[in-house]
């Protein structure tokens, strides 16, 4: 029994710590993109919303992963973690576009999770809830001031969970902005990933998110990661945004490519230890998108959405 709990602990720490401390790699690729915005799904309007001239045409909202942000970080020029993976996406976009045309806003949130190795940190639930509230606040503020501005949302690891949750609310018409205001969403290493939900560019993986795999063990894992609720998948998926959500996962990433059932999870927990480094290598891993890297692909995908809407 002690050995089993130890293995579970290894899996949980693996599946939740996921620190994206990666080296910036600035590459590009002419890959085709799937799930671009198509015909409007709702009632068409005859006149576009009127907004001030200073409003950007597009706002990119980026949600960093665990330990890659801070609650008091600067959302326009974040410095909380200079090695944050999201910087390898946001900085090229800021260099490519004028801030008058494209606003790039990085989510400032605590980005922690309490576990057996860091009892003094904010719990995963509290960190995630804080990030979700701040992202929704930014969406509301921009949409109220600039109703014609459209959004591209990108998240990594814990940030992907936040971005995915917000996208699911918007897609089910329960969000803070209308779905027609969202051009696209990219989730990198989403802990709530499920097959058939969203689009899956790049290399196919048949695993699921760690929160989905570990949902049956939620009560058992609380002593190991107190305040980290394993919520499973997102009921209803991404709704009308399904074709606009890119769910990106590296093979053998324990966060998003976990075993489908708990029994296999226990058997494979030790094997996942050696694969844990995969989660920190999206900026250099050639196995996610052949011929390019994840950050370069996302930059090109976002550029295509900005230029071609």
Curated annotation (Swiss-Prot):
Q: Which InterPro entries does the record associate with it?
A: AB_hydrolase_fold, Cutinase/axe
Q: Which catalysed reactions does the entry list for this protein?
A: a butanoate ester + H2O = an aliphatic alcohol + butanoate + H(+)
Gene3D superfamilies in alphabetical order? alpha/beta hydrolase
**Broad class of where this protein is predominantly found:** membrane
Record's superkingdom? Bacteria
**Membrane topology according to the record:** Single-pass membrane protein
| Localization per Swiss-Prot or TrEMBL | Cell membrane
Protein name as annotated: Carboxylesterase Culp6 homolog
């Amino acid at each position: 029994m002690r050995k089993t709990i130890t293995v579970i602990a290894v899996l949980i720490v693996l599946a939740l710590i996921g620190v994206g401390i990666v080296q910036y790699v600035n590459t590009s690729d002419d890959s085709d993109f799937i799930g671009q915005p198509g015909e409007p799904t709702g009632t068409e309007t005859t006149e576009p919303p009127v907004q001030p001239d200073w409003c950007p045409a597009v706002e990119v909202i980026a949600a960093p992963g665990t330990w890659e942000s801070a609650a008091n970080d600067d959302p326009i020029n974040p410095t909380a973690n200079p090695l944050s993976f999201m910087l390898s996406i946001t900085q090229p976009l800021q260099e490519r576009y004028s801030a008058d045309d494209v606003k790039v806003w990085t989510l400032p949130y605590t980005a922690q999770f309490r576990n057996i190795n860091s009892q003094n940190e904010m719990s995963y639930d509290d960190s995630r809830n804080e990030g979700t509230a701040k992202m929704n606040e930014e969406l509301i503020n921009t949409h109220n001031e600039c109703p014609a501005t459209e959004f591209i949302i990108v998240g990594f690891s814990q940030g992907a969970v936040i971005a995915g949750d917000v996208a699911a609310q918007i897609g089910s018409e329960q969000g803070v902005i209308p779905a027609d205001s969202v051009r696209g969403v990219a989730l990198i290493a989403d802990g709530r990933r499920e097959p058939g939900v969203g689009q899956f560019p790049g290399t196919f993986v048949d695993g699921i998110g760690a929160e989905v795999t570990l949902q049956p063990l939620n009560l058992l894992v609380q002593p190991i990661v107190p305040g980290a609720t394993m919520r499973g998948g997102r009921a209803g998926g991404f709704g009308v945004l399904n074709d606009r959500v890119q769910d990106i996962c590296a093979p053998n990433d324990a966060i998003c490519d976990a075993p489908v059932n708990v029994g296999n999870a226990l058997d494979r927990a030790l094997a996942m230890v050696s694969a844990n480094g995969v989660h920190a290598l999206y900026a250099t891993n050639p196995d996610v998108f052949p011929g390019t890297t994840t950050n370069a692909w996302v930059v090109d995908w976002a550029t295509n959405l900005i230029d071609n809407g």
